[in-house]
């Protein structure tokens, strides 16, 4: 069996009620999509442990979940703030030009002039488009520590090469 690669897709929040329910914070594009990716793993004391989802529902505008074996508030409290992960193998293949954020994080960003702008450290969602957060190297000639580059495929992002972990952008190094 191949080694699992776990990607964080959410986090458990505070307890809800006395029967072992927990609030859920999903980092998937659509909050309910987190339930499409099973099984879940929780990071407990630095180790990923598989858990089974028993039930979920909306309470007001929050998602709440019940995990198997979590029957009371005290047991649920042990899981508060635990990250929720899933094996990357459960993610569906995307169409060309679409990328999962976890594939872009860690890529080197280079502009059309060949200037190494830094490494993608995270992604941000804005109302109109996603944004690459690029941390510059310590010897950045423009004195930049971080750049925010819109992920506009073809307009700004010219090429994504996941094999070499390189993103080529049409972006002035001074910005």
Curated annotation (Swiss-Prot):
Pfam families: PRC_RimM, RimM. GO terms for biological process: ribosomal small subunit biogenesis; rRNA processing. Its main location: cytoplasm. Residues 95-175 form the PRC barrel domain. One of its GO terms (cellular component) is ribosome. One of its GO terms (molecular function) is ribosome binding. The PRC barrel domain binds ribosomal protein uS19. An accessory protein needed during the final step in the assembly of 30S ribosomal subunit, possibly for assembly of the head region. Essential for efficient processing of 16S rRNA. May be needed both before and after RbfA during the maturation of 16S rRNA. It has affinity for free ribosomal 30S subunits but not for 70S ribosomes. This is Ribosome maturation factor RimM. It comes from Glaesserella parasuis serovar 5 (strain SH0165). The lineage of its organism: Bacteria, Pseudomonadati, Pseudomonadota, Gammaproteobacteria, Pasteurellales.
């Amino acid at each position: 069996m191949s080694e699992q690669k776990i990607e964080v897709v959410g986090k458990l929040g505070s307890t809800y009620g006395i029967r072992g329910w927990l609030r859920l914070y999903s980092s998937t594009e659509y909050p309910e999509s987190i339930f499409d990716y099973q099984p879940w793993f929780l990071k407990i004391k630095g180790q990923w442990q598989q858990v089974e989802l028993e039930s979920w529902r909306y309470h007001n505008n929050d998602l709440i979940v019940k995990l198997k074996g979590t029957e009371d508030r005290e047991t649920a409290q042990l899981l508060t703030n635990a990250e929720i992960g899933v094996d990357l193998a459960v993610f569906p293949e995307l169409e060309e030009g679409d990328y999962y954020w976890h594939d872009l994080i860690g890529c080197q960003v280079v502009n059309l002039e060949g200037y190494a702008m830094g490494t993608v450290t995270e992604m941000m969602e804005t109302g109109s488009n996603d944004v690459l957060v690029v941390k510059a190297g310590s010897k950045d000639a423009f004195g930049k520590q971080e750049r925010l580059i819109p992920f506009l495929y073809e307009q700004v992002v010219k090429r994504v090469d996941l094999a070499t972990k390189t993103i080529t952008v049409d972006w002035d190094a001074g910005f």
